[in-house]
Amino acid sequence: MLTAVLLSCALLLAMPPLQGAQMGPAPLEGIGRPEEALFLELQGLSLQPSLKRITEEQAEESLLQEAEAKALAEVLDPEGRKPRSPRRCVRLHESCLGHQVPCCDPCATCYCRFFNAFCYCRKLGTTTNPCSRT
């Protein structure tokens, strides 16, 4: 029994070298110079495009500008919203208390009064809200 276990262990240890498997990272010494590249016809091609270097402040500023522009476009575009189907929405001035469905008008919201005891769909308009112009 012991000989079978030892023989199995020896075979398992000898299998990778016999199959030509390489343990660990591949040796990459000497490939750093273009004249020693493996594929000389591909040495001029770059797989990754060169990136423009910018400072951290510039990157953060551009990211914030993109996020603000996207958020502003979503808020100021009520025409982009589709009217909801009448089966799954509450009409204007009807009770929306306890309903999990939205108001039919895309510019309306469920407005609650008296400690959320009385709720109905209503258009809330302000001077900055594009829905108030309708």
UniProtKB/Swiss-Prot annotation:
Residues 113-115 are annotated as: Interaction with melanocortin receptors. Residues 1-20 form the signal peptide. Plays a role in weight homeostasis. Involved in the control of feeding behavior through the central melanocortin system. Acts as alpha melanocyte-stimulating hormone antagonist by inhibiting cAMP production mediated by stimulation of melanocortin receptors within the hypothalamus and adrenal gland. Has very low activity with MC5R. Is an inverse agonist for MC3R and MC4R being able to suppress their constitutive activity. It promotes MC3R and MC4R endocytosis in an arrestin-dependent manner. It is found in: Secreted; Golgi apparatus lumen. Disulfide bonds join C89-C104, C96-C110, C103-C121, C107-C131, C112-C119. Residues 21-84 form a propeptide. GO terms for molecular function: neuropeptide hormone activity; type 1 melanocortin receptor binding; type 3 melanocortin receptor binding; type 4 melanocortin receptor binding. Residues 89-131 form the Agouti domain. The lineage of its organism: Eukaryota, Metazoa, Chordata, Craniata, Vertebrata. GO terms for biological process: adult feeding behavior; hormone-mediated signaling pathway; neuropeptide signaling pathway; positive regulation of feeding behavior; regulation of feeding behavior. One of its GO terms (cellular component) is Golgi lumen. Interacts with melanocortin receptors MC3R, MC4R and MC5R. InterPro entries: Agouti, Agouti_dom, Agouti_dom_sf. Keywords: Disulfide bond, Golgi apparatus, Knottin, Secreted, Signal. PANTHER family: AGOUTI RELATED, AGOUTI-RELATED PROTEIN. The presence of a 'disulfide through disulfide knot' structurally defines this protein as a knottin. The record marks R84, S85 as: Cleavage. This is Agouti-related protein. The keyword Amino-acid biosynthesis does not apply.
